[in-house]
Amino acid sequence: MPNSIITVCCFCLSLLVGSANAQTASEVVIEAFKGFDQDYREKWGFDELREDGEKTWFGRFSPESGGLWTLMRVDGRDPTEEETAEYLEEKEAQRERETSDDEQGGPPRSPIDSIDLTTLVLEQDTSESLVYSFLPVGRGDQAKMMKKMRGELSVRKSDSCIEYLEITNPKPFRPQITVKLNRFFSRFDFGSPTSESAAVGATCENIVPLGTQFEMDMKALGLMNIDVSVRATYSNFVLFSAPES
């Protein structure tokens, strides 16, 4: 009997110690994003392969002179002057969106800023990753719309790094009276810009987006249909300048 009591006490004590050492969901996610390099476009050059349902665009980004894009190929051939002009105009518009301030509803500087850390719920715990659901947050005009969305992210166990982040709408809704959003899906895949794979005990640093996906199906005024699907992958990263210490 005494041995049984001791065994039970030891088991209970181990549970208490384990609970004390366990990280909260917000701590896990904050740690997973610590390695994200929010200034990666100031340091790294890379290729972008983008498919928009009509054409496949292959371009190269360089951080020189504040960020330069060069269109290399379109559908495997040399681009026309019109395609080059269209590409550069779109990239400039993208740059303006990404650098817009909070009041203009620009995207968050770091992906973690789109997560309400108080709403994290562990959905899956596998041998390789932890998958959490969350409620996303937006800025400016996007704040109200984000309340209708649901988010999901995955943290890799081998190095405690973020793997992907998704935001989607569980069901159709009207962000405005005259607009119905049937489908919204946004996904970012993250990883190291080098070819080194994550290993047990590896550190989580210099994490950048390696792929993006965006889908939207929207109807405006009951007449205009907007159906967008864009996928992009990023590769061949070259360090332009070493991060300042």
Positions of predicted regions on the chain:
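Extended lipid/amphipathic-ligand handling interfaces
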Residues: 151-156, 185-202
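RNase H-like DDE/DDD metal-dependent nuclease/strand-transfer catalytic core used by mobile genetic elements
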Residues: 208-210
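Positively charged n-region of N-terminal signal peptides that target proteins for export
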Residues: 1-6
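Structured extracytoplasmic
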Residues: 22-149, 161, 168-181, 194, ...
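Bacterial N-terminal signal peptides
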Residues: 7-16
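Beta-strand-dense domains in secreted/periplasmic systems and polymorphic toxin scaffolds
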Residues: 165, 212-214
